[in-house]
């Protein structure tokens, strides 16, 4: 539980959670109230932390190498490539990082050429469809999912 809370704090401090949440919500964002949006952002940030913590469970004692970094002028984003090595092979991870208010924030994580943000948008769009793109109704489902994921993670 303490490890998860540390992961959650790190993600909340270093990921552009609000911006990612808004992008992932898609068209349901515009029809929601301010309170619903704030609740959704908090639920999304917890979902993201749970998702990353769950992925990290399978990793320990891996070695990694920073392979490359480059600045994409068009999108004003820095891309940092790293390779993570394990007994079964290696995996390529690209961090998309953007500067905002004199700080750098992770805006996406691309693992084996698959964007976390694009994947989440697709996943959430399917779930939002089931609530007719009503963000308030979706928040209830997301809270239930977060609670279930949290219990699985700490048990």
Q: Where would I find each of the regions flagged by the language model?
A:
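A mature extracytoplasmic/lumenal domain signature
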Residues: 44, 70, 83-86, 97-99, ...
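Juxtamembrane/interface motifs at transmembrane-helix termini
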Residues: 26, 57-63, 126-128
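Surface-exposed aromatic
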Residues: 37, 80, 106
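Early exported N-terminus immediately downstream of N-terminal targeting peptides
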Residues: 1-52
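Surface-exposed, charged secondary-structure patches
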Residues: 50-94, 141, 145-155
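Short beta-strand edge/turn micro-motifs at domain boundaries
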Residues: 90-118
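Low-complexity, intrinsically disordered terminal/linker segments enriched in charged
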Residues: 108-155
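Short leucine-rich amphipathic alpha-helices used at interfaces
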Residues: 1-2, 6-9, 13-15, 20-21, ...
């Amino acid at each position: 539980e303490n490890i998860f809370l540390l992961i959650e704090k790190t993600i909340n401090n270093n990921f552009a959670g609000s911006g990612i949440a808004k992008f992932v919500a898609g068209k349901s964002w515009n029809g929601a109230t301010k309170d619903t949006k704030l609740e959704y952002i908090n639920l999304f940030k917890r979902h993201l932390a749970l998702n990353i913590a769950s992925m990290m469970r399978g990793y320990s004692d891996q070695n990694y190498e920073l392979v490359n970094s480059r600045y994409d002028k068009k999108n004003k984003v820095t891309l940092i490539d790293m390779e993570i090595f394990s007994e079964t092979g290696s995996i390529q991870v690209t961090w998309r990082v953007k500067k905002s208010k004199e700080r750098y924030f992770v805006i996406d994580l691309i693992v084996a050429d698959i964007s976390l943000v694009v994947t989440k948008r697709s996943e959430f769009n399917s779930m939002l469809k089931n609530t007719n793109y009503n963000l308030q109704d979706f928040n209830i489902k997301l809270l239930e999912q977060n609670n279930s994921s949290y219990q699985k993670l700490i048990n």
